[in-house]
Amino acid sequence: MPWLSGGRRRRRGQPREAPREPPPSAQPQREPPPAPPAAVPTPPAPSAPPPRARESAELPLPAGWEEARDYDGRVFYIDHNTRQTSWIDPRDRITKPLTFADCVGDELPLGWETVYDKQIGVYYMDHINKLTQIEDPREQWRREQERMLKEYLIVAQEALNAKKEIYQIKQQRFELAQEEYQQLHKMCEDDSRSYASSFSGYSTNTKYDPHQIKAEIASRRDRLSRLKRELTQMKQELQYKEKGVETLQEIDRKMSSTHTSYKLDEAQAIMSELRTIKKAICTGEKERRDLMHSLAKLTDSFKNSCSVTDSLVDFPHHVGVPGDAGVPQQFCDAGSQTDIIGEFVFDDKTRLVDRVRLNWQYEEARKRVANIQQQLARLDNESWPSTAEADRDRLQLIKEKEALLQELQLIIAQRRSAGDVARLEEERERLEEELRRARATSAQGATERILLQEKRNCLLMQLEEATRLTSYLQSQLKSLCASTLTVSSGSSRGSLASSRGSLASSRGSLSSVSFTDIYGLPQYEKPDAEGSQLLRFDLIPFDSLGRDAPFSEPPGPSGFHKQRRSLDTPQSLASLSSRSSLSSLSPPSSPLDTPFLPASRDSPLAQLADSCEGPGLGALDRLRAHASAMGDEDLPGMAALQPHGVPGDGEGPHERGPPPASAPVGGTVTLREDSAKRLERRARRISACLSDYSLASDSGVFEPLTKRNEDAEEPAYGDTASNGDPQIHVGLLRDSGSECLLVHVLQLKNPAGLAVKEDCKVHIRVYLPPLDSGTPNTYCSKALEFQVPLVFNEVFRIPVHSSALTLKSLQLYVCSVTPQLQEELLGIAQINLADYDSLSEMQLRWHSVQVFTSSEPSRTREAGCAGESSARDPAHTISISGKTDAVTVLLARTTAQLQAVERELAEERAKLEYTEEEVLEMERKEEQAEAISERSWQADSVDSGCSNCTQTSPPYPEPCCMGIDSILGHPFAAQAGPYSPEKFQPSPLKVDKETNTEDLFLEEAASLVKERPSRRARGSPFVRSGTIVRSQTFSPGARSQYVCRLYRSDSDSSTLPRKSPFVRNTLERRTLRYKQSCRSSLAELMARTSLDLELDLQASRTRQRQLNEELCALRELRQRLEDAQLRGQTDLPPWVLRDERLRGLLREAERQTRQTKLDYRHEQAAEKMLKKASKEIYQLRGQSHKEPIQVQTFREKIAFFTRPRINIPPLPADDV
C-alpha cells in the first residue's frame, strides 16, 4: 500500500480541528435499534477484540488521515484528502477479512463492529450499509440454510406424494392390462377346446378367428411387458426419492432441532471420512469399468450381439495427432553445448497454417463455452432446482389419470358383471373429479418452469459437447506444438526437473474433496437412444448449394462456426513463461502484473489452455486489423467450398478448370499446394530467402537451423483416380404397414473421383427432412476402408407418412473420416422422391454424386492475373508489396511467438504422463530444494555475471504467401506444387562444433509492427547506461530492442527478485521464482457451516451406496449372461433385446472396451474441463447479484438427494 512506506503519524486524543459535521455514517448507527423480543437472554460480556485489531493499531495511518474522537468518546477517522469522515479504520483493509467467507474463528469482516447497549445488550453495526441488527451475522447464514432446507422439504414431500400417486395409478393400469390378457388367453383356450371336441368342421364351431386372437394376445403381452418395465423403473426412482427425502428429514432433525454445531475434532473426522469415501468411490469406479469390459466380451460371444451395437462404433474414438505418424525420432547428446545442432523442427511454414487454424478453432470453442455458461447462469438464477421436476410429475400424474380413465371406459363398455360395472363406474367418476380439480389448479408458472428446465437440459448438453470439443482441440494443439520441440541449452539441463514440482503442486492435493467430487456434474435428461445415428456435424441444406454462400467445416455443435470473425482483440497472453522469454519476439512480462482472472489456475489444463490461447490468435487479429486498415476487402473469414458444376455468381465454366501447371518463380513466389489454401486473390511480393535461427538460451551458441526434408505432403487418392464420375447405387421401398421408407444403400462406384485422403474411411449419411423435431432424420452407415468399389449393403428404415413422401427429397452425404475422427464432406447425391412412380416394390437406381472440392482454382487464376497486372503496372506492384510486407512481418511474428511456447508445451505434456507416486515424490523433493534455493538464489545471481543483452528477431522475413481465408479454411487434400522442399530448399549452412559467433547481417532491417496491448502488462525493464552485446552471439539484425537481465539460466531472467504482494489466507512463499497466482477453489471461497459438512457427508454416503447398487446390478447381469451361455444359448436373451436401456448399457460397454489408454486420458481431460466449466457457472451466478453464490450452491446440494441418478437400469424379469 502507498502509506506503508511513509505517512503522517496518527494522533491520539482530540484532533486539532473538530469536524464541521458529524461523521456521515454516525447518524444511522446512533439511532436506537429496534426493540428486542420479549424474552431477551442475558447479555454476554463483550468479547475481547481479535488479535488482528492490535495489528491494525500497530500500522501507521495513511497519508492525509487522522484519528479523532467524538463527544461520546467514540473513535472516528478524518480523511483530509477528500474532507470526509468515517467510522472505519482505513488500516482494516489490510488486516481484516473482506467477507464472511474469509473469516477465521470469531472474526468480523471489514466494516462490521460489535457494540454493547445497556438496554438491548450486544448488537452489530454494518458501517458499509449503515445498518444495525441484533442477530449475530456469523450465525445468520446458518439459520438461512435451515430455513431453506425446511422449505425444500415441503416441496420435496409434495413431489414424492405425486410420484407415489403416479406409481399407484400405473399399478392399476398394469393390473387392468393383466386382467385383460388373462381373459383373452382363457378365451383362446376355450375356443381351442371347443374346436377339438367338435367333429362338424372348423368354420361352424369356432366363435373367434384364432389368428386374430393370437395377434391380440401378442399385442397385449407386449403392452404388459412395457408397463412392467415402466413400473420397475418408476419403483427404482421412487425408492431413490424416498431415501433422499428421509435423509434430508434426518439432517433437519439433527441440525435444526438440536442446533448441532460441530467442533474442530468432529469436523476433522468428517473430512477424513469424506476422503476415505472418495478413495472407495475411485476403487468402485475401477471395478465398474472392469465389469463393463467383461459384459462387452460376453455380449460379443452371442450371435445376435450386432443387434445391440451401434453402427458408429467402427469409428476410431481416439484422438490422434495430425502429422505425427511417420515422424522419425532424433536424439542427441546434450551434455556439451557445442553438440546441439539447433532445433529439430519441420519447416515452420508448413506448420503455420495448422497451428493458426487450431488456435482460432480453440478460441472459438472457448468463446462458445463461455456463452453457454452465461446462459446457464441466467437460467439458474431464474428457477429453483427440482421445482420443474415436481411440476413435470404433476403433469405426468394428470396424463396417467387420463389414460386410466380411457381404459376404464373401454372396460365398462364390455360385457361385465353388475358388481364390476358399479365398481368401475365409481372409479371413473372419482378420476373425472380429480382431473377437473387438477386442471383448475394448474398454474401457468408450471409450464414456464418446465420450458426453462428443457432449455437448461439443452444448454447442459451443448456445454458437454462444447467442452469435449475444446479438450480435443487443446490436445491437438498441444501435440502439434510439441511436435516442433526446440532444444534448449545443455546448461539448463536441470530446469525441467526443477520445474516439475510446480506442475505437481498446481494439480492440487490428492486428498482434497471439491464440490463436484461430492455432488457430481450438473445432470440433464439424456436423449433417446433412437437418435444415436444422428449426424455429428451440421448438414448443409441442398437448396443453398446453388448459391454462392460460403460454408466451412463445422467442427462442433451448431452455432460453433461463424462465417467471419469480429476484429475485436482476444484476451491472449503476451509472454507465456520466463523460460521462453529469450526465444520470443516480445519483451517479457511479469506474471505478477497479470490481472486477477476469473477462472481457477490450479489445474494443468487451465494453465495449458492459457498458454495455447494467445500467440497465433493475437497475430491473426492483428493481421485482420491491418488488412482492414489497408483497404483489402477481399479477405473472407472462412474458406468457401463449392461443388463441381455449381458455379457461383459471376463465375463461368472457364473458371472451373484445373489450376495452371506452373507459376512464375521470381519476385513472386508460389508456395507448394498446401498453397491451394494459401494463395490470396492478389499476388504477394515477398523475399525468397529462407532463414530460421535458434537461440541456445544463455550459452552463446548460435547456429543456423538445419532443415529436414521429411515434411512431404499427403498424397490424395484423387491424383490417380479415373475420370469416371462417382455414382451411388440406392434402392427405395415404401413399407405401407409401418409407414416407413426403406433406403437400401448398396455401393459407391468410382470413389476415386472423390478427394479422399490417405488413411481415411468413407461412410454415407442418409438425410430426410423430418416430420417433427422429435423424429430422427439422419442415419449413418458403417465407415469402410477406401477400396474400389465401396460396398455398403445397409438398409435404413426412415419413418415418413405416405402422403408426404412425394413432397420430400432424400439426400445422401458422402463423408470421409480421418484417424483423428475429423469428418469431411466429399459429395452429395440428391434423390427426388417425386420421380418414383410407385414404391410398393424395391426400385434400384444409380445416382450421380456431386463432388465437393476447394474453390481455390478460381483464386489461383485470379492470383495469376493479379501477378500479370502487377508486372505491367509498377505502381500497382509497389502498393501490393507494401501490403504484403506488413502481412509477412505479422506472420513471421506469429511463427516466432508460437515457437516460444513449444518447449513449455512439450514439457507440460511430458509431466502429465507421470504417475501419482512420482508426483508425490517430486513434491517432497521440491519442498527440500526450495529452502536451499532461497538462500543460494541471490548469491547465484551475483556470481553469474549479470548483464544486459539485446533480444533480436530472425534477420529475414519469412516467406509466407497465403490468404487469411486459407488460414482459417477447410482442410483440403494436399497437392504437390512447384514450391516443394525437393525443388526449392536452401542447403544448410555447415558449421563446426564450436561456438559460432559469425553470421550474415542484413543491411536494412525492417521494423516490426508494434505489439498490441495484451492481458499481461509489460514489466518494467532494467535501465542501464549502456547496452551490452555479447559478441553477436544472439540473432543479429535487431528489429525491436529491449533490455533483458540474464542470470546463470534464463529461467528467471525476465522477472525481478522482489517480494510477492500480500495475499490473505495463503501460505508464505518459500521461493522467489514467480508463479501464476491461483484462485482458491469454490469450496474454500464459501463459508462452510456445520450443516454444509453434514450435507457433504450424507451426499458422499449416498453416492457410495448408489455405486454399490450399480456394481451389484452389473454382477447380476454378468451372472445371468454367463448362465445363459452355460445353458448353450447362442443368442442374447429376449429380455435384453426388449429393453432399450439394457441395449444402451451394452453399447456403452462395447465403447469402453474399444477405448485405448489415450482415449481414456482424453475423456478424463474433457470431464475435468467440464468440471471447471461447472464451477465457473456458480461463480457467474454470484456475479449477477440476484442471489449470492452460497444460496445457489446450497440449493443444488439439497436438490442432489431427491434427484435420481440411475446409470444401471433394473434387470427385468423374463416372465410377465
Curated annotation (Swiss-Prot):
GO terms for molecular function: kinase binding; molecular adaptor activity; signaling adaptor activity. It is found in: Cytoplasm, Cytosol. Residues 570-598 have a biased composition (Low complexity). Residues 1-63, 487-508, 546-612, 634-668 are annotated as: Disordered. Pfam families: WW (PF00397). Keywords: Coiled coil, Cytoplasm, Repressor, Transcription, Transcription regulation. InterPro entries: C2_dom, C2_domain_sf, C2_WWC, WW_dom, WW_dom_sf, WWC/KIBRA_Hippo_Reg. One of its GO terms (cellular component) is cytoplasm. GO terms for biological process: cell migration; hippo signaling; negative regulation of cell population proliferation; negative regulation of hippo signaling; negative regulation of organ growth; negative regulation of transcription by RNA polymerase II; regulation of DNA-templated transcription; regulation of hippo signaling. Residues 722-847 form the C2 domain. Transmembrane segments: none annotated. Gene3D superfamilies: 2.20.70.10, C2 domain. PANTHER family: BOMB/KIRA PROTEINS, PROTEIN WWC3. Regulator of the Hippo signaling pathway, also known as the Salvador-Warts-Hippo (SWH) pathway. Enhances phosphorylation of LATS1 and YAP1 and negatively regulates cell proliferation and organ growth due to a suppression of the transcriptional activity of YAP1, the major effector of the Hippo pathway. This is Protein WWC3. It comes from Homo sapiens (Human). The lineage of its organism: Eukaryota, Metazoa, Chordata, Craniata, Vertebrata. The gene is WWC3.
